[in-house]
Amino acid sequence: MTNAKEKKKIVLWLIVLAILAAAAFTVTAIVRHNQRPAWDGGYSVHISEVMTDNKTCPNGEGVLCDWIEIENTSSKDFSIGGYYLSDETGKGKYCFPAGTVVPARGYLVVWCSPDEEGDYAPFALRKAGGETVCLMNENRAVLDSAVTAACRSGQSLVRGSDGALIPA
């Protein structure tokens, strides 16, 4: 009987340890999510994800085109009107319209196509990678940039822990 009691104690302790480990992982994930990435240059807005060969995510008009996601890591809305986005360093190819806001701890997706009319960034991204995507302030000073990488059709690129864009 002692053996059965000891086995029950061991099983009970293993369950308790598993619950504690899961709770510790959850708390760690929450804390890390709310921290700013080390590579963000001290700005609360940065390029967080890029799609260079979109075959899976149509925009509200049903168009499949490249897109760039801007993330705001701060607890306040960020007015991005007058800022620029480009696929070339120093060239502000797309100017965010006045009144454009990236919500607090939120995202803004910019659709990119030189062929579409309306509110599109007027450039496409190379599918093969090696292109620098830049977010610039109203004076065209670079706040964030990232070099695209080659990836499969329909696969997005996300920022790795070192800030590089890597296949998701």
State the predicted function of each range.
Residues 2-168:
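Activation on beta-sandwich/Ig-like modules and their edge loops
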